[in-house]
From Swiss-Prot:
Record's catalysed reaction(s): a quinone + NADH + 5 H(+)(in) = a quinol + NAD(+) + 4 H(+)(out)
Protein name: NADH-quinone oxidoreductase subunit B 1
GO biological process: aerobic respiration; electron transport coupled proton transport
Gene: nuoB1
Organism whose genome encodes this protein: Symbiobacterium thermophilum (strain DSM 24528 / JCM 14929 / IAM 14863 / T)
GO terms under cellular component: plasma membrane; respiratory chain complex I
Lineage of the species this protein comes from: Bacteria, Bacillati, Bacillota, Clostridia, Eubacteriales
Enzyme class, broadest EC rank: translocase
Alphabetical UniProt keywords: 4Fe-4S, Cell membrane, Iron, Iron-sulfur, Membrane, Metal-binding, NAD, Quinone, Translocase, Transport
Amino acid sequence: MSADGVFRDQGGFVTTTVDSFLRWAQSNSIWPLTFGLACCAIEMMNLASGPRYDIARFGSEAFRASPRQADLIFISGRVSNKMAPVIKRVYSQMLEPKWVVAFGACASSGGIFDNYAIMQGVDNLLPVDIYVPGCPPTPEAVIYAVQKLRDRIRKEDPRGGIIVRG
């Protein structure tokens, strides 16, 4: 039996259910899309292209430029009311199943910008699966968030936000 309980060894044969296998495959091949609206996007670039962090070992081989090729979207930065329809359109073009990570204090809660033009958290617009706090969050916190999302996909947990403390 594997550590996550997907595959079972029964006398030299490996057995599993189709649902368990598909959840295992989805959790090991997450294709992220970044939607950077402010300074946290710089930290995402550090994670995606820096030699220090190898995100390929977590199933995210490369960041996608098209929402039609992605199943995970990182929203980073403050979301203005003018940008909300664009984010909704990008989210609707993503493949099912799809997940949302609110990356940073501004995407999670609006940050310090409490005015009429800024949404107070992207969860007012999209169903957020993981909240990564920080200004900006560290790459380690993002890697931890992706690991938590992978665990959720494998266990088929219901939707609802997880706050990552990293």
